[in-house]
Design a protein with these regions (language model features):
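Extended hydrophobic-aromatic, low-complexity segments
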Residues: 46, 61-62
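Inter-Walker segment of RecA-like/P-loop motor cores
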Residues: 1-49
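Conserved aromatic-histidine-acidic binding/catalytic patches
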Residues: 44, 56, 161
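Glycine-rich nucleotide phosphate-binding loop and flanking beta-alpha elements
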Residues: 42, 59, 112
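Generic beta-strand/beta-sheet core signal
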Residues: 29, 37-39, 54, 80, ...
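Non-catalytic, compositionally simple segments
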Residues: 9, 62-185
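Walker B catalytic acidic pair
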Residues: 52-58
Length: 185
């Protein structure tokens, strides 16, 4: 919403924006939409092709696996597959044109004994497998300073504060996981 006044392209593409206490949806002219859902057990029944799990480490693992990931049940079928040229193709042949659903996880790092660390490790392993399509990256605070999104003097001030926690800073701003994994001592 806040970017629309400065972007002619966004104004051309976005049909309608609805933000109420119980709903947040951005509808596009091409019939696509972005919908925000609360990460709880009541979110059952929705469908999506791309799911962004913001601050995913704060989501209950059972809600993530048993409710939210179920949104990705069916793949998006491009409209051209319904045209005369393609509609006769066997199901197996059509599969190569389907857009695979995507999951995007956003979060700061956290404690290594939390389930989210195991998830990140799994993503790293899968990223190394050439038969899979995974990606992970960390964007530490130095990048924000370089890009002018974070003031370096403000960072220095925060670090000099008597209540500064280097552990929390490392997890939140340096993409560093903290502690030991289960069973380590």
């Amino acid at each position: 919403l806040e970017l629309m006044p400065n972007s002619e392209n966004l104004r051309k593409e976005i049909k309608k924006v609805t933000v109420t206490s119980g709903q947040a949806i951005v509808e596009f002219h091409n019939t696509s939409y972005i919908e925000v859902v609360v990460a709880n057990d009541n979110a059952r029944g929705g469908r999506a092709n791309i799911f962004i799990f913001d601050e995913f480490r704060q989501i209950d693992i059972d809600v993530l696996n048993d409710v939210l990931k179920k949104y990705l049940a069916s793949e998006r079928e491009p409209e051209f597959l319904k045209t005369e040229k393609y509609k006769h193709l066997p199901k197996q042949e059509k599969r190569k044109y389907l857009d695979r659903n995507k999951q995007i996880y956003l979060s700061s790092a956290f404690f290594k004994d939390h389930w989210s660390y195991k998830e990140v490790q799994s993503i790293c392993r899968n990223m190394l497998d050439d038969t899979k399509r995974y990606f992970i990256c960390g964007l530490p605070y130095e990048l924000s300073i370089k890009e002018g999104m974070l003031n370096e003097d403000s960072v220095k001030d925060e670090m000099s504060n008597a209540n500064f926690s280097s552990i929390k800073w490392s997890m939140e701003m340096e993409c560093l996981w903290f502690g030991d994994v289960d069973g380590a001592f």
